[in-house]
């Protein structure tokens, strides 16, 4: 019975985005984006990406990142910033890249939060 309850709780958390695959570091992500010359990858679907994305971001879904990353980021020690809708898919992509040996992967979390933080920084 406890095992079933635990599974239900984990399922609910996963569906709300509260159980994330990787730790979100939005502040560091924004800092590197503002410095420029940092690879930014939107891991959402092509349809989501077409609806709006950060300027200069590439679109590689979290399901395709392992196959496509070396073509855009051959240096495994260079910073790579990931984001998605909630931070969950970018967390999954972060874990994938770290398993492939990438050392500076930052899960910047949700696009809408990044956009709001950028606007706040510009208005100061």
Question: What kind of feature is each model-predicted range?
Answer:
Residues 7-17:
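Bacterial N-terminal signal peptides
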Residues 40-42:
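Structural scaffold elements adjacent to functional motifs in cytosolic proteins
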Residues 83:
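Short, surface-exposed ligand- or partner-binding patches at beta-edge/loop junctions that are enriched
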Residues 2-4, 17-38, 47-79, 88-124:
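Rhodanese-like catalytic fold shared by cysteine-dependent sulfurtransferases
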């Amino acid at each position: 019975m406890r095992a079933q309850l635990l599974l239900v709780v984990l399922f609910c958390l996963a569906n709300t985005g509260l159980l994330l695959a990787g730790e979100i570091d939005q502040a560091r992500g924004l800092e590197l984006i503002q410095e420029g010359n940092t690879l930014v990858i939107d891991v959402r679907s092509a349809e989501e990406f077409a609806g709006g994305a950060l300027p200069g971001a590439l679109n590689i879904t979290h399901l395709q990142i392992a196959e496509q990353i070396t073509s855009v980021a051959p240096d495994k020690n260079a910073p790579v910033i990931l984001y998605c809708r909630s931070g969950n898919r970018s967390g999954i992509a972060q874990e994938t890249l770290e398993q492939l040996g990438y050392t500076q992967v930052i899960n910047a979390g949700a696009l809408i939060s990044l956009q709001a933080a950028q606007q706040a920084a510009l208005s100061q």
